[in-house]
Design a protein with these regions (language model features):
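A surface-exposed partner-binding patch
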Residues: 1-93, 176-179, 203, 207-213, ...
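Long, contiguous interaction/recruitment modules in multidomain scaffold/adaptor proteins
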Residues: 40-174
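Alpha-helix C-terminal capping/termination sites
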Residues: 187-191, 222-226
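Inward-facing hydrophobic residues that define packing positions of alpha-helical scaffold repeats
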Residues: 199, 233-234
C-alpha cells in the first residue's frame, strides 16, 4: 500500500486519511467547523487521480487559511517540478455550516478555486474522467462511491452530446476553468460579443477571486482594448492577491495597472486615494475591527507578493482576526503554527 506524502505508514493513521476522518476531526478541532458530508469522497477521488494524501496539520509554508488534503507534483512553466496542494480554504464564519471551497495551491500561497464545494469538485472529476476516457474506465467514479452514484449517472455526459465545459456549467455548476473554456469557445467561433458577455458572467460569479479579473485583463489586452485591460488589472489588485494566480500574474497585473515599482502597501494607498476624500468623510472614522480586518488583508497580500513569509506572520495575522471579530479564523491560524506530529 502507498504511504502518504508526509510519511504516514499504512496503519490506522493512513486509514484515517483515506476515509476523511482525520481531516474532519481537524476541521472540528482547529476551525470549530463541520466538514462537508462529501469529504471522504473528495479525499478518495484525489487519491484516485494520483495525489498523495497529506495530514491536515502539515501546514508549514502553506496558505494560512488552507487545510491540506493531498498533494501532487506537476511541471511548472519554467520546466521545473512544482508541488500542487489540494485543500479546503477556511472562510469567514457564516453563521451556519462552514463554507469551504476546494482550492489548488501552488508556490505555497497561490490558491486557485477548483470547486465551490466538495460535492461540485467530486461531480466534475467524475464527468471529466468520462469525457477523457476512451474505455469504460471508472476509477474516479468508483473512488467516489455512493456519493458519486448520487451525483452522476455513468454515461450521461457521453449521451448528452454536449461539450465538456457546457455540460459542466449546465449540469454541475460554475467553475473558473469552465467559464474560461466557454469564453475561448466563443472566440474560436469569432463571436467576440458572446465572449465578453460570458466574461461578465464569470466576473459576477467569482468577482471576489483575482483570477477572473486577470483572465479578463489579459483578454482585453489581446483585443487591443488597453484601457479596459488596465481597469480589469486594477480590479484584480483589489482582490486577495493569493487568488490572482501566482507571482508572474501579480507582476503582470501591477504592470498593466500602471503601478510598476510599488509594493503592496503603496498600491493599497493608491486604491484608497482613488475613492476620493468625500468617500472617507462619508464613511467616518474606521473602527478597530475594520482596521484589524484591513491589516489582515494587507498581511495576506504581502505574503502572496513574497514580501513576507508565513512563519513570520501567523501570530500577528491571528491577532488581527481576533481583533476583527473572527475568532474561528484566528484559532485556525494558530493551529497552523503548531508542530506536525504523527
Amino acid at each position: 500500500m502507498k504511504t502518504t506524502r508526509d510519511g504516514a505508514d499504512d496503519s490506522a493513521a493512513a486509514g484515517n486519511l483515506r476515509d476523511g476522518s482525520a481531516h474532519a476531526a481537524y476541521v472540528r478541532d482547529a476551525a470549530n467547523g463541520k466538514a462537508p458530508a462529501e469529504l471522504e469522497a473528495l479525499v478518495r477521488v484525489l487519491e484516485a487521480r494520483g495525489c498523495e494524501l497529506v495530514r491536515p496539520n502539515a501546514r508549514r509554508g502553506l496558505h494560512p487559511l488552507v487545510m491540506p488534503l493531498a498533494a501532487t507534483t506537476t511541471r511548472g512553466e519554467g520546466g521545473e517540478d512544482e508541488e500542487e496542494v489540494y485543500g479546503l480554504m477556511m472562510t469567514e464564519e457564516s453563521g451556519g455550516e462552514s463554507v469551504m471551497p476546494v482550492v489548488r495551491v501552488r508556490g505555497g500561497v497561490h490558491a486557485a478555486l477548483v470547486g465551490k464545494s466538495a460535492s461540485e469538485f467530486v461531480h466534475r472529476a467524475i464527468v471529466e474522467e468520462e469525457a477523457r476516457s476512451d474505455e469504460e474506465r471508472t476509477t474516479v467514479a468508483a473512488a467516489a462511491g455512493a456519493v458519486g452514484v448520487s451525483l452522476h449517472n455513468h454515461g450521461a455526459f457521453t449521451t448528452s452530446g454536449k461539450e465538456f465545459d457546457v455540460y459542466v456549467t449546465t449540469h454541475i455548476g460554475k467553475f473558473p476553468s469552465s467559464m474560461e473554456g466557454l469564453v475561448k469557445r466563443h472566440l474560436d467561433r469569432g463571436d467576440e460579443q458572446s465572449a465578453l458577455i460570458t466574461c461578465d458572467l464569470y466576473k459576477s460569479t467569482f468577482g471576489e477571486w483575482g483570477a477572473p479579473h486577470v483572465f479578463i485583463s489579459d483578454l482585453y489586452g489581446k483585443l487591443g482594448r488597453d484601457e479596459e485591460a488596465r481597469d480589469a488589472a486594477r480590479h484584480a489588485l483589489q482582490t486577495p492577491w493569493s487568488t490572482i494566480g501566482g507571482s508572474e500574474a501579480i507582476e503582470r497585473m501591477i504592470r498593466v495597472a500602471g503601478w510598476q515599482g510599488k509594493n503592496v502597501a503603496e498600491i493599497k494607498e493608491v486604491l484608497e486615494s482613488r475613492r476620493g476624500p468625500s468617500a472617507a468623510a462619508f464613511d467616518g472614522p474606521k473602527s478597530e475591527k475594520q482596521l484589524a480586518r484591513e491589516e489582515s488583508e494587507l498581511l495576506l497580500d504581502q505574503l502572496a507578493a513574497g514580501e513576507i513569509e508565513a512563519a513570520t506572520v501567523n501570530q500577528r495575522l491571528a491577532e488581527c482576526y481576533m481583533n476583527a471579530g473572527k475568532p474561528t479564523l484566528a484559532k485556525f491560524i494558530m493551529c497552523g503554527s503548531m508542530p506536525t506530529s504523527a
